[in-house]
């Protein structure tokens, strides 16, 4: 299917007064405490990961006040510390930050909402002192790990060009020794697709049984994915088929995020009408200066000729609700909504996808107001074909 791309259209007067009652609820707040990362992964989308910008502790009160005052914060949520390498902000920063956030929760959390903390980290800095902090609060740690060293170290290198696999595994050992809740996100590149058995056995042998696969994406400063080549779609399908075989017979249970999400939709007969990445204020991202955005977290640090940056406001001067009437928000929301509607009208997979992620549409097609992407073909369509085919075969329907 060819992507349907339209040029960005002027905002219609009829959408000037945006109905915000269907926005949210906010279930994920991503706080970017530092732009700096101690790795230099070659597929990273972030342009400023060499800069050592840090979130001042004084900004935490207006951040938490904005979160709890928002009309979109009506249910429990997670505070995810992400972008750059969040642990590079330092252990003492989080000791003070978590204590302050508890205080601000008591002051501003009038709805008595429950929230927890999570990190997405490369794991390199984790030691016993970090684990002591993680045990003090309800913390989940996501680790970026691409499988065995020969795959991981090809792309995830230090700033001096050395592989980071051994250091990441040391961090994981600390988490496991302390029974800290953790999971893995693995980026699949062209090379990964030849090694489903090796990746599966590596994770299983190291008791890493909760894994999500991210495709290497065309996004931000990563202007070309290694998966965007002839033949990789078929290789990816073969990878998924083999991984399904391996996980479906695994003891102990091995959970793959992509399989789990699709199976849940099939078993419950639910279908998606949207995703958190195209529904305003389901996700809120806040950077080290208090600037905030919504939709895809990847958009916050990016500047583009078409839209400028994706900063909608700042917690020091704006509420989440107030920016919904600004021209910038309405222009992006309009294009995002039009793209989702086109997906609804043209794609058989819409109920499994909900209209996709705007960042993928923008970076691949040049507009939010567009449809199918490479990311969609890999992440949704191929997974659906493999899982549905395997389930039908198991039921004798194939």
From Swiss-Prot:
Binding site for [4Fe-4S] cluster: 37, 41, 44
Cofactor: [4Fe-4S] cluster
Keywords: 4Fe-4S, Iron, Iron-sulfur, Metal-binding, S-adenosyl-L-methionine
GO molecular function, one term: oxidoreductase activity
Pfam family for this entry, one: Radical_SAM
Highest taxon of source: Bacteria
Annotated ranges, domain Radical SAM core: 21-253
Coiled coil: none
The keyword Iron-sulfur belongs to this UniProt entry's keyword annotation: yes
Keyword Iron-sulfur: yes
PROSITE patterns: RADICAL_SAM
UniProt xrefs under NCBIfam families: rSAM_GlyRichRpt
Membership in a protein family: Belongs to the radical SAM superfamily. Anaerobic sulfatase-maturating enzyme family.
UniProt protein name: Uncharacterized protein sll1766
Organism: Synechocystis sp. (strain ATCC 27184 / PCC 6803 / Kazusa)
């Amino acid at each position: 299917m060819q992507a349907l791309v339209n040029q960005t259209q002027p905002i219609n007067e009829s959408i000037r007064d945006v109905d915000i009652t269907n926005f949210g609820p906010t279930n994920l707040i991503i706080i970017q405490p530092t732009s700096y990362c101690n790795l230099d992964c070659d597929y990273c989308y972030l342009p400023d990961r060499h800069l050592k910008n840090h979130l001042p502790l004084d900004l935490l009160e207006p951040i938490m006040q904005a979160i709890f005052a928002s009309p979109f914060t009506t249910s429990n949520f997670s505070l995810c510390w992400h972008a750059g390498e969040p642990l590079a902000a330092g252990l003492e920063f989080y000791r003070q930050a978590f204590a302050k956030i508890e205080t601000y929760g008591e002051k501003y959390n009038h709805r008595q909402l429950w929230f927890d903390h999570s990190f997405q980290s490369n794991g390199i800095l984790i030691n016993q002192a970090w684990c002591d902090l993680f045990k003090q609060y309800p913390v989940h740690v996501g680790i970026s790990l691409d499988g065995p060293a020969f795959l991981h170290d090809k792309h995830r290198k230090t700033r001096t060009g050395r592989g980071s696999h051994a250091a990441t595994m040391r961090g994981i050992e600390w988490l496991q020794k302390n029974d800290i809740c953790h999971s893995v996100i693995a980026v699949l590149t062209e090379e990964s697709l030849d090694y489903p058995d090796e990746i599966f056995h590596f994770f299983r042998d190291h008791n890493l049984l909760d894994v999500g696969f991210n495709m290497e994406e065309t996004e931000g400063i990563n202007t070309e994915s290694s998966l965007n080549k002839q033949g990789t779609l078929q290789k990816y399908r073969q990878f998924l088929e083999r991984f399904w075989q391996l996980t479906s017979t695994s003891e102990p249970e091995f959970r793959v995020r992509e399989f789990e999400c699709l199976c849940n939709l099939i078993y419950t007969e639910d279908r998606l009408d949207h995703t958190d990445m195209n529904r305003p204020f389901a996700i809120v991202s806040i950077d080290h200066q208090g600037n905030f955005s919504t939709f895809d977290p990847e958009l916050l640090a990016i500047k583009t000729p078409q839209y400028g940056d994706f900063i909608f406001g700042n917690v020091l001067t704006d509420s989440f609700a107030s920016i919904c009437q600004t021209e910038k928000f309405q222009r992006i929301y309009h294009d995002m909504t039009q793209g989702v509607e086109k997906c609804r009208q043209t794609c058989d997979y819409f109920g499994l996808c909900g209209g996709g992620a705007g960042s993928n549409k923008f970076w691949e097609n040049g507009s939010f107001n567009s449809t199918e992407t490479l990311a969609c073909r890999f992440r949704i369509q191929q997974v659906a074909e493999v899982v549905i085919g395997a389930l039908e075969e198991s039921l004798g329907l194939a």
